[in-house]
A protein has these predicted regions:
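Rossmann-fold dinucleotide-binding core
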Residues: 114-214, 250
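Short acidic low-complexity segments
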Residues: 53-72, 180
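Short, well-ordered alpha-helix to beta-strand connector turns
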Residues: 24, 59-60, 73, 98
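Small-residue-rich helix-loop
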Residues: 233, 241, 247-248, 253-255
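Rossmann-like NAD(P)(H) cofactor-binding subdomain of soluble oxidoreductases
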Residues: 77, 82-144
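NAD(P)+-binding Rossmann beta1-loop-alpha1 motif at the extreme N-terminus of oxidoreductases
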Residues: 1-51
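Long, compositionally biased stretches enriched for glycine and/or charged residues
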Residues: 223-229
Length: 255
């Protein structure tokens, strides 16, 4: 059993809490915004559906403060997009993190970016590991639930020098993580950088025709905003959950 501090209460964090809890690991859960994690805390865990079936996963601990989540943790997993990494790195510095930190997902230069934040603050960087993309396709159908429609069957993982033990520990949690020689390989394999833009363009007419209410659950997407849509990691091999119907039913063709 591994003690894992999951940071982030969006769809990715909720999916990680679900899988790691079901696998028997000790999961501590923390989020920067109390409002986002509160529905899960009030419910005592995560209602999940999709590739892991339907059920309820209760983490070992909901942490109100980051040091509480990190206390005794073997690994801290940051399940947040890159725009949050700087703030999370600052919180990890303030909390005095010493365990390995995994960026799930990383971004282009993600581990290098986080290491530089630590050095600039005069703090030694912890062992840093990054993944080339998020390990899940997931969305939150409600504030206290997650729908997981895919799990990566292979993705790239790498660490900065000194993070080798963290990388090996990560691979015990996610055997699909294929180790690379350095973080340049994972950074340059950031498929989201390439895929989100064409996904938004190809979905533009659908999103505009629905007034910003278009969904694409079959791709694990999120509620679309006008003229914007998100498409996740189509070039990664996933275990699709073909049995999960769209809650909105069949979508009509848009002309």
């Amino acid at each position: 059993m591994t003690a894992v501090a999951v940071i982030g209460a969006g769809a990715g964090g909720a999916a990680a809490v679900t899988e790691l809890t079901l696998a028997g690991h000790e999961v501590r859960w923390w989020n920067r915004s109390p409002a986002t994690i509160e529905p899960f805390r009030a419910a005592g865990g995560v209602r999940y559906e999709g590739v892991f079936g339907d059920g309820f996963a209760a983490p070992a601990r909901f942490a109100t403060e980051l040091p509480d989540a990190l206390d005794g943790a073997d690994l801290a997993m940051v399940c947040l997009p890159s725009l949050a990494h700087e703030a999370v790195a600052g919180a990890l510095i303030a909390a005095g993190v010493t365990c390995a930190v995994v960026l799930n997902p990383g971004h282009t230069g993600g581990a290098l970016h986080v290491a530089e934040i630590f050095r600039t603050a005069g703090a030694p960087p912890p062992p840093l590991v990054e993944l080339s993309t998020l390990t899940y396709i997931a969305r939150k159908p409600s504030p206290d639930a997650v729908r997981i429609t895919g799990v990566a069957s292979r993705l790239r993982a790498a660490c900065l020098p000194g993070g080798e033990m963290g990388l090996e520990l990560l691979r015990t949690l996610y055997p699909a993580a294929a180790p690379e020689g350095d973080v340049l390989a994972t950074s340059l394999a950031n498929v989201n950088l390439v895929l989100h833009t064409p996904g938004a363009l190809l979905s533009a007419s659908w999103v505009e025709a629905t007034g910003g209410e278009g969904f694409h659950e079959d791709r694990g997407g999120k509620r679309a905003a006008p003229r914007k849509a998100t498409m996740h990691a189509a070039t990664i091999s996933f275990r699709p959950d073909s049995e999960t119907p769209s809650p909105r039913g069949p979508q009509r063709a848009l002309r």
